[in-house]
Amino acid sequence: MLWILIEASSSFIPAYVIERFYWEDRGMRIADVVIAEIVFAWVMLIGEIPFGLLSDRWGRKPFILAGFVCEWLSFTVLLEAYSLPAFLLAMALAGIGGAALSGALEAHVYETLRMHRREERFETIWRVISIGGLLTSGLAALVGSYAVRSVDLIWHYHVSWWVLLGTVLLTFFLKEASREQDGETSSLKTLLNGFSFRRVYVRILCLVLLYGATIDFVDEFWQLYLRDQTIPMVHFGFVFVLFQIMQAIGASLSRFRSPVGWAMIYIVCLAGLSVASPLVSIGLLGTLYLCYGWAEPYVTTVIQDVAPTNGRATFTSLISVIERLAVLGTGTLFVFVERVFSLQMTYAALGLVSLILLLLYSVTRTRQN
C-alpha cells in the first residue's frame, strides 16, 4: 500500500499539464527545451551507474529518499526560473533525482516480495502501482486544466512543490528489505562481462530503447503539437487524462503478451502523427500511450527477472544509461528534423528509430542462447 501511495503522490503534479507553456511563458524556445532535456539525460547518464552501485551496497531507501528530495529541489528552482541557466539547474537536479531513483523503487518492491517468497507476483503488483500513478496524474491534469482558467501558471508549480514535499515525508516510512547476498556485491566489471555473454540482454535492450528513446519526446512535446493542430489549451487537461487512462488500460492488459504486435502498433501511430488531422492525432497519441502502458511493466519485470541478485540496481542503471545515450542521439535527430521540416515531421523520424529497433529485436529474438 505504501508503494502505491508514494507512486500516486509523486505522480500528482498539476504542473505537467502546462509545463511547456510555463517554460515558453518564461522565454524558453523549443531548442532550449531540447537542450534542457539533453542536460537532464547527461546528468542521468553520469549518475545512474554510481548510484546503482551504491544502492546495491547501502540499500534502496536512502536513494529513493534522495531522489525525491532532488526532484522537490528541482521544483523549488523552477518556481524562480526566468533564464536558461536556471532551467538547466532545475533539470540537473531532476536528473540527479532520477539517477538516484533509477531502479531503486523497482528493486525495493522486488526484493520485498522475494523476502516473502512472492516474487512471481511482481508484474501484477507493479502494474497496480503503475495504474495508481497514472490515475493520480490524470486527476492532477484535471485539476491543472480547470485551474488554468482562473489562476496563473505558477500556481500549478506551487501545488506540485507541496505534493513532492509530501512524497519525501512518505518515503521515510519505507522499510528496507533484506537482500540475499551471493558473496560480495557484484562489481561493474563483473556485470559488464555477464552482460556481453547473454544475448537475452540484447533483446531486452532493443525493446527498452524502442520505447525509451522515443516516448520522452512524445511526453515533452504533445502540448505544442496539439496547439499547432489548433486544439485549444483549455482542453489539454482532459486530453492528458485520456492519455493517462489509455496508459492505465495498457498496464492492465497483461494477458496480451505480444511485444512485436504492440511495437508495430506503436510505430504506426508515430508515423501517423506526421500527417494526422487534429482529432485523429489525439486518437493516435492515446494509442501510443496504450502501447507504452503495456510495455513499461512488462519490460520492468523482465529486467528484474534476469538481473543478478547482488547487483540488481546497478544492472538496471546500466540498462538505463544505454537508454539515456539513445535519447541523446534521438534528441539530435529530433532537433534537426524540427528545424529543417516541422514539429509534426519529427514523429515520422521517431517512428523510423523505433522501426529500426524493432527489426533488431526481431533478428536477435530468433537466435536462441
Where are these regions (language model features)?
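C-terminal ends and interior cores of transmembrane alpha-helices
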Residues: 69-83, 87, 172, 265-278
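Loop-to-transmembrane helix entry/capping segments in MFS-fold secondary transporters
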Residues: 30-31, 116-129, 233, 309-319
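Cytoplasmic helix-loop-helix junction between adjacent transmembrane helices
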Residues: 92-133
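Symmetry-related core transmembrane helices of the 12-TM Major Facilitator Superfamily/SLC fold
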Residues: 133, 155-173, 347-363
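Juxtamembrane intracellular "pre-TM" segments in multi-pass secondary transporters
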Residues: 175-206
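Helix-loop boundary and gating motifs at the non-cytosolic
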Residues: 1-46, 199-241
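Conserved MFS/SLC helix-loop-helix module at the cytosolic interface between two early adjacent transmembrane helices
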Residues: 45-82
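C-terminal transmembrane helical hairpin of 12-TM major facilitator-type secondary transporters
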Residues: 259-299
